[in-house]
Amino acid sequence: MSVAVVLFTSDLRLHDNPVLRAALRDADEVVPLFVRDDAVHRAGFDAPNPLAFLADCLAALDAGLRHRGGRLIVRRGEAATEVRRVAEETGAARVHIAAGVSRYAARREQRIREALADSGRELHVHDAVVTALAPGRVVPTGGKDHFAVFTPYFRRWEAEGVRGTQTAPRTVRVPDGVASDPLPDRDCVENLSPGLARGGEEAGRKLVTSWLNGPMADYEDGHDDLAGDATSRLSPHLHFGTVSAAELVHRAREKGGLGGEAFVRQLAWRDFHHQVLADRPDASWSDYRPRHDRWRSDADEMHAWKSGLTGYPLVDAAMRQLAHEGWMHNRARMLAASFLTKTLYVDWREGARHFLDLLVDGDVANNQLNWQWVAGTGTDTRPNRVLNPVIQGKRFDARGDYVRGWVPELAEVEGSAIHEPWKLQGLDRAGLDYPDPVVDLAEARARFERARGLD
């Protein structure tokens, strides 16, 4: 009987998985394989939160495969070595994998291809599995390889259209006797954020249904409301591929309305960042547009930012949410990033690395390029805009409920005064166990403008 290997990466699902479907068409039996790559461990990208969420995802994937007569094979080691070993053990002629956009993904694909070629085997790479529209599917006129501005990209993205979706297979036949390492166990992962969400395809699909049938209708008006949190919280599931971006686009449009269209636009933003990184993989850690910044380094200020003790309540609330949940509202991410890179004038890479250490949805394309967008080294057409945490608080947390939820030291402060506690007088200020601001906003803005040559 013919055998094919399916190497699961960022597509840990059975529904609408073109990689799995292609392998099932290709062979009588398939080997669903996940490799815990040593290269990821060496690079320090196996932080506790994403590792625990991954454990949930793999357990759910294995359960789904067993329900269909198969099982998940897990190996630990170098990806290329383990893939070749499994192919040789099972006699598989071809390996199927979803296309990635990061430098790591490119190196992994190349090494697997070379390892398989030594024994006459092939690697098949499938587009539009991780994203709704494949990077490079649409390109600007004039010889450029990617769009640097979202609006023209979105017009072409909409005109191109998203691929159709596929159902989950009814059966999956796996060869007998294929050895597997144990599945990773969430309960064995230490130092988790206490409010970390659960992962897995079933959890993701339930969240999709709940989102589409209710909160999405208010997304256009409420997505920036920090306390209301009218967001989907689907980003971890998109990152690990337990839900399909293409399926989300179709289902959101079926529901329709302004909320659905606004949500689809955010999915297109995700694709936008992936097509940038696919063409500019160096932008994961190098400036997309160099500004020749001479970044500051202050250990005390960096500690205050990471710990949620800057003295600016909205920034501190955001950072405490990140520590507790391994997730943060997008508006809060923008503010926290602006405060670090423009108010404190610290290298965006320092903040991006901290986010990747904690975020359960730490997608390299979206995390790094959003950090660059805020820092003014990325694709933003207004690179020197500075977000004021007081103004942002009064606009997007007008009653202060988001701050009160994460900064209990300020729970008794009434109204918009919660965003400027340093202005409280007498006993009202003395009774607060909350730090003074680490920096004066006006002085920090002037420093940034001098550094960027704007004064």
Curated annotation (Swiss-Prot):
Its cofactor is FAD; coenzyme F420-(gamma-Glu)n. Pfam families: DNA_photolyase, FAD_binding_7. Its EC number is 4.1.99.3. One of its GO terms (molecular function) is deoxyribodipyrimidine photo-lyase activity. Residues 2-131 form the Photolyase/cryptochrome alpha/beta domain. Binds 1 FAD per subunit. This is Deoxyribodipyrimidine photo-lyase. It comes from Streptomyces griseus. The keyword Nucleus does not apply. Belongs to the DNA photolyase class-1 family. Monomer. DNA binds at residue 392. GO terms for biological process: DNA repair; response to light stimulus. Keywords: Chromophore, DNA damage, DNA repair, DNA-binding, FAD, Flavoprotein, Lyase, Nucleotide-binding. PROSITE patterns: DNA_PHOTOLYASES_1_1, DNA_PHOTOLYASES_1_2, PHR_CRY_ALPHA_BETA.
